[in-house]
């Protein structure tokens, strides 16, 4: 709807330029926002105040001329001037109802359409270090990236998930040396954290062991068959742990999406040679570097992008450049989204610019770092165990499920044990994910089990319950969401407010896709649940005045249920028919 209003305003501006009311050459960014007070309309624009000065007119006078120049549109019932010159647009309720009926007739997509042409989008997410088990620091990249990827796919983009795992480097020499020294069974390797800790202790305590580990790195990089076999075994076990976690989190990553650091090994020398051929490479203290004028240190000295160390080794920047080139040349990506910690912002700014100057990306290819903040404990510091260690992600999920089980059992002591466990799993995992997804990704947030498991406020339990409440209406009738007939009629204020929000699902998802911000979808669903609650309390469904009114309200409830379920599914949250 906002796009429609922007188009109407643009047509009015063009007409006023033709009439000489406005000067030529104006290219304003037309802002259309949701009106806060629905008595003043559904949408508002400050365009008259923006252009009053170049027009040499008072804002209200220009607003009057804009209204007169606006083309008629059946979706708009009227336009009014408010305050110093705001244009307030009122939706036509009959046209709005027709849009919702059309959405109900499209159960697969709910009439959601992408703003703009479909693209090939690479989503770089999760990327755990395979030398260790996944910890809480991997949660944000994994679930934020997955949520955005789901939305992009739903809108019609071709999404290529890329799990850029850390499966190479000096740490693997240490692990291989320890594996040679103490051959481990698969069961022993199942606890990667302890295995890594033991190997690290040997590395720190024994120079002979450390030297052997460094030698194994060289042999591994040279393609030694025995080293590669040990490395492959270790990598496969580690990846199986990751896959178990992904499935538990209801994340769509699969082994086929893994494209680790090692996948680019054969291209690293080519990256350096090609940078040299373009004249970008400079030797500094024996290292091969790219210096970009716009990146400088605090004391104004150039800040290099090092692609090869003096000893010949490669760095993360080299691998990232190889990955960018692969994603451009082979995957043919139009857009690449990197869901990586915000603290890596400078690294990506530099690498993206080097890739562009080196010609590693095709024209129009977008490289976007979708940075995120830190998950902190109650003390405001990075989340740790009591002894200061990293918290295993699997342990966090175990505790979430147990806490949810206790909560659900207290509320529903009569429910069978198997069903309690099933509900607790959905509630616990969803609570952890939603507590993260509902925050702006760029923000830090404090992890709090009590808050995230509450049935009040913007939480997963509240939204899951809101969905079961809608489903319960149809369960009482013994019918499904698609069983309601007739047409939607919007008479009561609560019906109109709920309908207006339902109609904004497309806009919400396009916003998430453009900015990589799942919290926008979370806020939408929370608002929608609240509006349904108000509608449910003020507009009786089962006790409606007549069959037509009941069917209309059932259709509103059905679309609310479908939208809540679809939105939660895109976030990777499992819905329940009852709680």
Curated annotation (Swiss-Prot):
Q: Which InterPro entries match?
A: aa-tRNA-synth_I_CS (IPR001412), Arg-tRNA-ligase (IPR001278), Arg-tRNA-synth_N (IPR005148), Arg-tRNA-synth_N_sf (IPR036695), ArgRS_core (IPR035684), DALR_anticod-bd (IPR008909), Rossmann-like_a/b/a_fold (IPR014729), tRNAsynth_Ia_anticodon-bd (IPR009080)
The compartments listed are: Cytoplasm
Catalyses: tRNA(Arg) + L-arginine + ATP = L-arginyl-tRNA(Arg) + AMP + diphosphate
Query: What are the GO MF terms of this UniProt record?
Result: arginine-tRNA ligase activity; ATP binding
UniProt-listed GO biological process terms: arginyl-tRNA aminoacylation
- Top enzyme category: ligase
Tell me where on the tree of life, at the top rank, the source sits.
Bacteria
> What is the name listed in the Swiss-Prot or TrEMBL entry for this protein?
Arginine--tRNA ligase
What is an example of a Pfam family matching this protein?
Answer: Arg_tRNA_synt_N
Is Lyase among this UniProt entry's keywords? Answer: no
Keywords, A to Z, come to:
Aminoacyl-tRNA synthetase, ATP-binding, Cytoplasm, Ligase, Nucleotide-binding, Protein biosynthesis
Enzyme Commission (EC) number: 6.1.1.19
């Amino acid at each position: 709807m906002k796009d429609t209003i922007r188009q109407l305003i643009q047509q009015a501006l063009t007409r006023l330029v033709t009439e000489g009311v406005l000067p030529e050459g104006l290219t304003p960014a037309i802002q259309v926002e949701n009106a806060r007070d629905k008595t003043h309309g559904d949408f508002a624009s400050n365009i008259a105040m923006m252009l009053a000065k170049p027009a040499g007119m008072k804002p209200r006078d220009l607003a009057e001329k804009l209204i007169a120049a606006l083309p008629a549109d059946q979706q708009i019932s009227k336009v009014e001037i408010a305050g110093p010159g705001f244009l307030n647009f009122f939706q036509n309720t009959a046209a709005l109802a027709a849009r919702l009926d059309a959405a109900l007739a499209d159960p697969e997509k709910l009439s959601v359409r992408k703003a703009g042409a479909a693209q090939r989008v690479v989503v770089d997410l999760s990327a755990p270090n395979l030398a260790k088990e996944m910890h809480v620091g991997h949660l944000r990249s994994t679930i934020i990236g997955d949520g955005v990827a789901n939305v992009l796919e739903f809108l019609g983009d071709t999404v290529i998930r890329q799990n850029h795992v850390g499966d190479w480097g000096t740490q693997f020499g240490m692990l291989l040396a320890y594996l040679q020294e103490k051959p481990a069974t698969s069961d022993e390797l199942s606890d990667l954290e302890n295995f890594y800790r033991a190997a690290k202790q040997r590395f720190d305590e024994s120079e002979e062991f450390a030297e052997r580990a460094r030698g194994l790195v060289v042999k591994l990089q040279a393609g030694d068959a025995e080293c590669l076999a040990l490395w492959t075994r270790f990598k496969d076990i580690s990846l199986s742990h990751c896959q178990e976690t992904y499935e538990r989190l209801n994340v769509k990553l699969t082994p086929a999406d893994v494209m680790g650091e090692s996948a680019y090994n054969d291209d690293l020398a080519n990256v350096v040679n090609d940078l040299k051929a373009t004249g970008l490479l400079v030797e500094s203290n024996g290292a091969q570097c790219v210096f970009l004028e716009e990146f400088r240190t605090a004391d104004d000295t150039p800040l290099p992008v090092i692609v090869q160390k003096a000893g010949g080794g490669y760095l993360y920047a080299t691998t990232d450049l190889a990955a960018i080139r692969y994603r451009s040349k082979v995957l043919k990506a139009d857009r690449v989204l990197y869901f990586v910690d915000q603290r890596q912002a400078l690294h990506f700014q530099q690498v993206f610019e080097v890739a562009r100057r080196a010609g590693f990306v095709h024209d129009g290819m977008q490289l976007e770092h979708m940075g995120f903040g830190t998950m902190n404990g109650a003390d405001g510091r990075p989340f740790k165990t009591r002894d200061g260690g990293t918290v295993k992600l699997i342990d966090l999920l175990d505790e979430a499920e147990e806490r949810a089980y206790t909560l659900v059992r207290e509320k529903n002591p009569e429910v069978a044990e198997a069903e309690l466990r099933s509900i607790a799993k959905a509630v616990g995992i969803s609570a952890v994910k939603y507590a993260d997804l509902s925050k702006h990704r760029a923000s830090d947030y404090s992890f709090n089990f009590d808050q995230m498991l509450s049935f009040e406020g913007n939480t997963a339990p509240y939204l899951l319950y809101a969905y079961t409440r809608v489903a319960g209406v149809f369960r009482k009738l013994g019918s499904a969401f698609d069983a309601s007939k007739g047409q939607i009629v919007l008479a009561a204020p609560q019906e109109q407010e709920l309908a207006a929000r339902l109609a904004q699902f497309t806009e919400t998802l396009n916003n998430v896709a453009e900015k990589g911000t799942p919290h926008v979808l979370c806020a939408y669903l929370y608002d929608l649940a609240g509006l349904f609650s108000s509608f449910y309390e003020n507009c009786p469904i089962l006790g409606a005045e007549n069959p037509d009114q009941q069917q209309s309200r059932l259709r509103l409830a059905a679309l609310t249920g479908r939208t809540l379920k679809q939105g939660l599914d895109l976030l990777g949250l499992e819905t329940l028919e009852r709680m």
